[in-house]
Curated annotation (Swiss-Prot):
Species classification: Archaea, Methanobacteriati, Methanobacteriota, Stenosarchaea group, Methanomicrobia
InterPro entries: ApbE-like_sf, MA1715-like, UPF0280
NCBIfam families: PRK04334.1-4 (NF003324)
Coiled-coil annotated spans: none
Name of the featured protein: UPF0280 protein Mbur_0309
Provenance organism: Methanococcoides burtonii (strain DSM 6242 / NBRC 107633 / OCM 468 / ACE-M)
Similarity comment: family membership: Belongs to the UPF0280 family.
Length: 237
């Protein structure tokens, strides 16, 4: 079953086999959003910095994950916020016994799947469309996160229609996708050179960039397949 859920700026699609798991995911989103909001009230700089950040050992788990991801990539902690909220929500479902759980937070997706699934990529006005990836079953939570310089409201300094990163660390995938998108220029060279910004980061499996009519790949990526993308079905803010 699938449910669309919004809490303030957080807009997600939650997929699970039982409604009770979906309710747990919604509770997790509310709890961790509140903890993040409280932390930002105590230090507003955390929300706006585009640079690595240090937090205390008693910071909330959501803050620690954001900081670790941003610091690994070399950018600000809020670069990982969507993926981190998604990962914590999926984690709450898995802890309760779910063997199949997906949270799509505006294109930053955390998932555990006990059957093959296809995740499509929306690349705006690019001529490269209706592509997706087949994700084989796994026994641990994974992430596929997408950032764009042409789609969506997030701060972005690049030209990517879609910069996609795969990692078992969902927060890291989100931060790295942001950095990859920021680094993407125009044309084949602009796409290929962008991968230099993330190629040395540990625990990133692979990445894909779509820019206009150009598409580049780096590392290990899942099998590419056709995915008929319907705009109205995309989780977006």
């Amino acid at each position: 079953m699938k449910e669309h859920f919004q809490l303030k700026e957080t807009i997600v699609t939650i997929v699970a086999d039982d409604q009770s798991y979906i309710e747990l995911a919604k509770e997790s989103i509310a709890v961790h959003r509140l903890k993040l909001e409280e932390y930002i009230r105590s230090d507003p700089y955390f929300k706006v910095t585009l640079e690595p950040y240090e937090c205390s050992s008693d910071a909330p788990e959501v803050v620690k994950r954001l900081v670790a991801a941003g610091n690994s990539v070399g950018i600000g902690p809020m670069s990982a916020v969507a993926g981190t909220i998604a990962a914590l929500a999926v984690g709450s479902m898995v802890d309760a016994g779910a063997t199949s759980a997906i949270v799509d937070n505006g294109g930053d997706i955390a998932f555990l799947n006990d059957r093959p699934i296809v995740i499509g990529i929306y690349a705006g006005q690019s001529s490269i469309r209706n592509i997706g990836f087949t994700l084989e079953p796994s026994d641990h939570i994974r992430g596929i996160c997408t950032s764009s310089g042409t789609v969506g409201p997030s701060i972005n300094f690049g030209c990517a229609d879609a910069a996609v990163v795969f990692s078992d660390d969902v927060s890291l995938a989100d931060s790295a996708a942001t950095e990859l998108s920021n680094a993407t220029g125009i044309g084949h060279e602009g796409v290929e050179n962008a991968f230099d910004t993330i190629s040395s980061i540990i625990n990133i499996d692979g990445a894909v960039v779509i820019q206009g009519e150009h598409m580049g790949m780096w590392g290990t990526i899942p099998q590419i397949t056709r995915a008929d993308m319907q705009y109205e079905c995309i989780t977006k803010g």
